[in-house]
């Protein structure tokens, strides 16, 4: 799979342009913007301190959490679509990857962002949209059987690169595999709680 990262035809200037565009799109902290606009203060001061949809949900506003999830996904998709139109498909993959990085490490708020599940999905939507259906199916299956949201996302992110590789989309598979590893690192606290049996389940109170 790693050999496919060396077989790209994209030029360095185009790759850099795609990376910058993607990173700037991904750095938009929608969770923080929406909660402040709604008069709910700084989402970083509650729960996990994360700017993603899961932490926004801890404000008690489901609409804002859903909007955050949607916008965090669409910023990666938009970066990929815009770059694909002007710079080509390989550049779009790079833009999606760096939108993911931008969400995790946003320049505007001290490089402290979310865990990247929504932007992972958004990148898929931008470069391999049919895989979003598989991601959703795996997430729902695991969530239904275990009621762990974090585990559902982790399993889905593990399945996606394998499925892409089997289907012959090896460049996207390689990039998504790297994104999966990074997201696993960002989820290390969740993984520790899952292993210890202390991770919160979907619908759990308190």
From Swiss-Prot:
GO terms for molecular function: acyl-phosphate glycerol-3-phosphate acyltransferase activity. The keyword Lipid metabolism applies. It is a multi-pass membrane protein. It is an enzyme of class 2 (transferase). The chain crosses the membrane at residues 14-34, 67-87, 91-111, 124-144, 148-168. Its main location: membrane. It is found in: Cell inner membrane. The keyword Membrane applies. Keywords: Cell inner membrane, Cell membrane, Lipid biosynthesis, Lipid metabolism, Membrane, Phospholipid biosynthesis, Phospholipid metabolism, Transferase, Transmembrane, Transmembrane helix. It comes from the Bacteria. One of its GO terms (cellular component) is plasma membrane. Its EC number is 2.3.1.275. It catalyses: an acyl phosphate + sn-glycerol 3-phosphate = a 1-acyl-sn-glycero-3-phosphate + phosphate. Pathway: Lipid metabolism; phospholipid metabolism. HAMAP family: PlsY (MF_01043). Probably interacts with PlsX. Catalyzes the transfer of an acyl group from acyl-phosphate (acyl-PO(4)) to glycerol-3-phosphate (G3P) to form lysophosphatidic acid (LPA). This enzyme utilizes acyl-phosphate as fatty acyl donor, but not acyl-CoA or acyl-ACP. This is Glycerol-3-phosphate acyltransferase 1. It comes from Rhizobium johnstonii (strain DSM 114642 / LMG 32736 / 3841) (Rhizobium leguminosarum bv. viciae). The gene is plsY1.
């Amino acid at each position: 799979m790693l050999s496919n990262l060396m077989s790209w035809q994209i030029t360095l200037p185009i790759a850099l342009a795609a990376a910058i565009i993607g990173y700037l799109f991904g750095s938009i902290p929608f969770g923080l913007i929406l909660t402040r606009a709604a008069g709910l203060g700084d989402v970083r001061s509650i729960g996990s301190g994360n700017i993603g949809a899961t932490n926004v949900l801890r404000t008690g506003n489901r609409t804002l959490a859903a909007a955050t999830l949607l916008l965090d996904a669409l910023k990666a998709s938009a970066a990929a679509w815009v770059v694909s139109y002007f710079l080509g498909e390989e550049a779009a993959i790079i833009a999606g990857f760096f939108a993911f990085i931008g969400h995790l490490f946003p320049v505007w708020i001290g490089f402290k962002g979310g865990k990247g599940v929504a932007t992972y999905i958004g990148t898929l939507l931008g470069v391999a949209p049919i895989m979003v259906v598989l991601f959703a199916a795996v997430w729902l299956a695991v969530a239904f059987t275990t009621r762990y949201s974090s585990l559902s996302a982790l399993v889905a992110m593990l399945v996606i690169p394998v499925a892409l590789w089997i289907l012959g989309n090896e460049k996207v598979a390689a990039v998504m595999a790297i994104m999966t590893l990074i997201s696993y690192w960002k989820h290390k606290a969740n993984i520790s709680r899952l292993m210890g049996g202390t991770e919160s389940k979907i619908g759990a109170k308190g």
